[in-house]
Swiss-Prot record:
Role of this protein: Non-alpha subunit of nicotinic acetylcholine receptor (nAChR). Involved in nAChR sensitivity to nicotine.
Name of the protein in question: Acetylcholine receptor subunit beta-type lev-1
Pfam families: Neur_chan_LBD (PF02931), Neur_chan_memb (PF02932)
Gene this protein is translated from: lev-1
Region (Disordered): 373-392
Extracellular side: 32-138
Glycosylation sites (chain numbering): 28, 58, 109
A GO term from the CC aspect: acetylcholine-gated channel complex
Organism: Caenorhabditis elegans
GO molecular function, one term: transmitter-gated monoatomic ion channel activity involved in regulation of postsynaptic membrane potential
Coiled coil: none
Knockout or disruption consequences: RNAi-mediated knockdown causes a resistance to nicotine-mediated paralysis.
InterPro entries listed in its UniProt record: Neur_chan_lig-bd, Neur_chan_lig-bd_sf, Neur_channel, Neuro-gated_channel_TM_sf, Neuro_actylchol_rec, Neurotrans-gated_channel_TM, Neurotransmitter_ion_chnl_CS, Nicotinic_acetylcholine_rcpt
Main location: membrane
Subcellular location: Postsynaptic cell membrane; Cell membrane
Amino acid sequence: MMLGGGGGCGAGGTWLGFLVFLAVSLRNHSTCEDIDAEDRLMVDLFRGYNSLVQPVRNRSELPMIVKIGMQLVLLINVDEKEQVMHTNVWLTMKWDDFQLKWDPRDYANITQIRVAPEKVWLPDIVLFNNADGNYEVSFMCNVLILSTGTVLWVPPAIYKSSCIIDVEFFPFDDQLCSLTFGSWTYNRDEIKLDFLTSDRVDFSEYSTSSIWDMMDGPAVLTSDRSRIEFQIRIRRKTLFYTVVLILPTVLMAFLNVTVFYLPTASGEKMGLTMNVLLSIVVFLLLVSKILPPTSSSIPLVAKYLLLTFVLNIITIMVTTIICNIYFRSPITHRLPPWVRKVFLDILPLLMCMQRPHRKNVIQRSHRRLLETGPSVEENPMRSGEHHPLCRHTHNQDSCRRVRIQSDELDDELSPEAQRAIDAIEFITENRRDEEITKQFRDDWKFIASVVDRFLLYGFFGATVGGTIGIIFTAPSVFETFDENATLVKLKQLYDMGLANDTVLGIF
C-alpha cells in the first residue's frame, strides 16, 4: 500500500512538471509571436514611408487638422523685471496619418505602437512668444501610433514666454500671461489647429505655486485657426509683500506724522524726519529693482511711497518753519495782531488747546518780581513808596505822589545811597524787560505749538486718506481666494469640455 501510494505521488509530480513546462513554452511562443508581429508591423508601416512629406493623399484633403492641448505641470517663475513667465508644460498634439493604419487582427491584435519621433512626420508646432530663443520642445519623446492611424505626441517642455506685466496694483495684482503656438512653416491653407478635448488648459497634474494663485486657464483660437493661445490667469499671493513692503511703508508714513507731536525744544524733529526720508528712499530703490521700468502705469506701492516721500519733504519744510517760529524773540520779530488773533485766540480754541490767561501770567510774574526782587526796607523811605516799584502798583496817583516826594529827597541822600538806588533801578528795569521778553518768547513758542498741533491733525488726515485712497483701491485687497477649490472646478470644466465659464459659477 505504501509503495503504491509513493508511486502515485511520483506520477502526479511528473504530470504537474509537464504541464508547467508546456505552459511556459506556450507563453514564450506567444511572446515570440507578438515580437515577430510587432517587427512585421514596423516593417510594413514604414516601408516607403517619408517622414518629410505631409501625410495627405492629395491636395484636396488640405488643410490638415492638428489638435493641440496643453497640460500645465508647474508655474516655475514669473519675472516681473524681465517680463518673462517660466513654465513646465506637457504639450499634446494629435493628428491622423493615413499611411500608419493597420488591422490589429493581422498583427497579433496589436492596437498601438511607439516609435521614435524622427521616424514619422511631425507638425512643426513652436512657441511664438518665447523669450529665450527656444522655439521647440526640449525633449523628443516617443510618438504613440494607434491602429486607426491616429498619431499622438506628448512632449514635455520648459518654456520661457514673454508676458506683459501690469504693475498698476502691485502687489495686489492679477496677471494674464499666454503661450501662443502655431506652425512655423505651414500656412493656414495647409494646417489648421483645433482644441484637443477642451478649450482650456489642463490642470490635472498641476503643482501649486508658493507665489501665485491659479485663477483660470482658457484657450483661444485665432480667426483663421493658424494659432492657438493658452492663457494663464494668476493672482499674486500678497502675504510676503504685505509683511516686507506694505506694512513698513504704512508705519513709516504714520511715523512721519509723529514729528509734529515731538517737542521742538528736544531738537530731534529734524533728525526724525531725515531718518524717515532715508528709509523711504531705500524702499523706493527696492521697488525699482523688483518691477520693470514701465511708463504705462505707476505701481500701487510706488504711488504710496511717492505720497509718503512728498509728505516727508513737506514735513521737513514746515519743521524748519516751526523751529524758526519757536526761537523768535521781540528783538528780531514783531508779533502782528492778526497772528496773535489767529494763533493765540482762534486756533487753540478749535483744537482744544488750553493756555493760562495772559493777565494771570503777568500778575504772577509781577508777584514773583516783588517777592524775589531787591528790597529797600533799610532805606529811610518806606519800601512801599520807593519810586522804582511804583510802576507795579495799580494806584497811579499814589505813584506820581511818591515820585514827587522821592525827587525832593534826592538831595538829602548820600552819594553811596544814590548809587545803590540807581543800581536797584537798573536791576529792576532789566528784570522787567526780561519778563516782557520772556512773555513774547512764550507767545512765539505757543504759536509754534499751535502750528504743530494743526499740522499733526492735517498730516494724520492726509496720511489716512492717502492710505485708504491708494492701497484700498486695488480690486483684490479684501477678496479671499481658495486656490484648491478653484483648481477642482477648473479640472471639472476641462473634463466636461465646456466653453462657458459660468456653468460652474467660478467667476
